[in-house]
């Protein structure tokens, strides 16, 4: 693509928790903001203050005390299209300050999403925002590209959904994809619950954001859960304190590793699913026996929920225990992995070979929204 921002493609990774958006060819997203739309709880409290009927992203976050916050993307699937349009509008006009009708736009989606979801995305892009061209890419595949590989298995854990996606020579293997509706938001809810057991009360949507911050700053994955529980019970070495916005200081101990342990033991929150180490193993076992070696040696972590300290070592330990004893197992945890989907999109959209892959406005007008299934896979 050209260096000027005039025809550069836009890359927008719509996560359940954060929107990452920017220009193809950049090495990091220009805009990262929460996928939140907030509406005033009480109409007319701020009469004459020029109060808006809705706020998006950081502005919604900063006014969360007077708003009800909603996430239009749940478990990686867009559930509220009106709010989603507001988020896209905010992305183009306020964050990136571009006219969408001048830029091809690459969007991302979770694997195994309903077909109607990507059709509606396509329709809104062409009909509401009038983009000249667009493409929908699978998030985990982009993460793998960002790590410089075309073969491997990606554990992509975000705020709304977690996936194990085996990719061979650049193509996701759909029959072996494992999807787990357990991710960052569930961990935040679980942390709210176990902090309440300690006597701290967090209930509102605004307080949930405080707990999310506690989770991001203080939680970690234990290498051996039982040992860590014993250590926490016998000494205060694992305790950390956190100052709430009102100045009150709370102490958290074993909650620090009990919260992310849920990824390995979903029964903690009453889910009957296998943990992320087992789903990764099951996913590999569904692949052809000849490529398993390549997958074991290329376990790539991606997404914000893989940012816990200790998660790579624990994955290594758990998968080694499941795999054949002679198998070489490698977990790759790139430091920029919370943005690796976006980075992969930036790489893909700026490749010269990709330029013929875009769905153009003309193709859309001829074939309608279903074109997306033929051109994006």
Swiss-Prot record:
Gene Ontology molecular-function annotations: ATP binding; hydrolase activity
Protein name in the entry: Actin, alpha skeletal muscle
Gene behind this protein: acta1
Tele-methylhistidine: modified positions: 75
Matches recorded under CDD domains: ASKHA_NBD_actin
EC category name: hydrolase
Main location per the UniProt record: cytoplasm
Organism: Cyprinus carpio
Modified residues (N-acetylaspartate): 3
Catalysed transformations (reactions): ATP + H2O = ADP + phosphate + H(+)
